Structures are given as structure tokens and as C-alpha cells.
Amino acid sequence: MSSFFKFYKASLQSHPKRTNALTTGFLFGLGDIVAQTQFPEPGASYDPMRTLRPFLYGAVLFSLVGDKWYRFLSTVRLGRLPQAHWANVLARVACDQLIFAPIGVPLYYTAMALMEGGSLEDVRIRLSEKWWSTLLANWIVWPAFQLCNFSLVPVQHRLLTVNVLSIFWNTYLSYSNSTASS
């Protein structure tokens, strides 16, 4: 396992965007694989195109947005308090949960609906069905995790740390998306 982390760290230093894109895409896709195999729809078989959509979302969109977001959050600072001060960590978690989460949740459902060939009306329906319940679930899962992430993990590894928990979160998102009526 340590050789994997050495490889990952070297890749992150030499090709940060590519490494984040592939890692994030892989983990979003893995979440869908888990959702399809562990929570299958009755009578449905595994759909590789369904897995491709979250892979592309993670690799192309979320990896870029997430990396920039975590770099921005690392600069959030209250007055002259040290970066690691608990008040700054809480401010980062508050920004993450009150700014990014309400935008990130609909971004996912919008991207999935459009990649599935849905219309803007389909997007509207999916968001009206899923946005609030997913945001509430997000607020149950992520704040405590992000407190640890922002206080213990170096900024260049925060996206990977989030991506590890995201295997489970992405499984939930994929399952939730697959149960949308649109």
C-alpha cells in the first residue's frame, strides 16, 4: 500500500490535474458500480454506460471544481488567527457546507440528467425530487468528516481524502439518481 501512496504522491506532484481527474473519475465510477451491484433495480442488469456517466462527471467536472474549491478553502481565514486555529477550520466547514454543498448537489443531478439525454424539464423534476433530501443527507455525513479533513490533511491531499469517503457517498448519489422519476 505504501508503494501506491508513493506513486500517487509522485503523480500528484508531476501531473496534479490528470491525477485528480483519474482518481476522482475512478471513485465516482466505483460508487456507481457498488450501487448497481449491491442495490440493483428489479430485473435490471449491470449498465456500463450508467457507470461511465459518473466517471466522466468526476473526471471532467468535479475533479477540477473540487481541487479549486479545496485550494480556495485553504485560504479562508478569520482575522489573524493561525491557519490551523479551530475557528478557521469551522469557517472552512461552514463555507463548504453552506456554499459548496447547496451548489454541488444540484450540479451532480443536473449533469447526470443531461448525460442521460434528459431535457431541462427532466432536470427541474429531478432537482425538485432529490435536491433537499440529498442536501440533508450531505449535512449528516460531511461536516464531521470535513472537520477532520480541514484540520489534519494537507491541502494537496484533501480531494483524495474526500474521494475515499466519496465511494460511499457516490454509491448513495448513484442510487438516489437511479430512483429519480425523470
Swiss-Prot record:
Recorded name of the encoding gene: SYM1
Family: Belongs to the peroxisomal membrane protein PXMP2/4 family.
InterPro entries: Mpv17_PMP22 (IPR007248)
Physiological role: May be involved in cellular response to stress. Required to maintain mitochondrial DNA (mtDNA) integrity and stability.
Superkingdom field: Eukaryota
Coiled coil: none
Protein name: Protein SYM1
Location in the cell: Mitochondrion inner membrane
One cellular-component annotation, GO: mitochondrion
Keyword Membrane tagged: yes
Keywords: Membrane, Mitochondrion, Mitochondrion inner membrane, Transmembrane, Transmembrane helix
Topology in membrane: Multi-pass membrane protein
Organism: Eremothecium gossypii (strain ATCC 10895 / CBS 109.51 / FGSC 9923 / NRRL Y-1056) (Yeast)
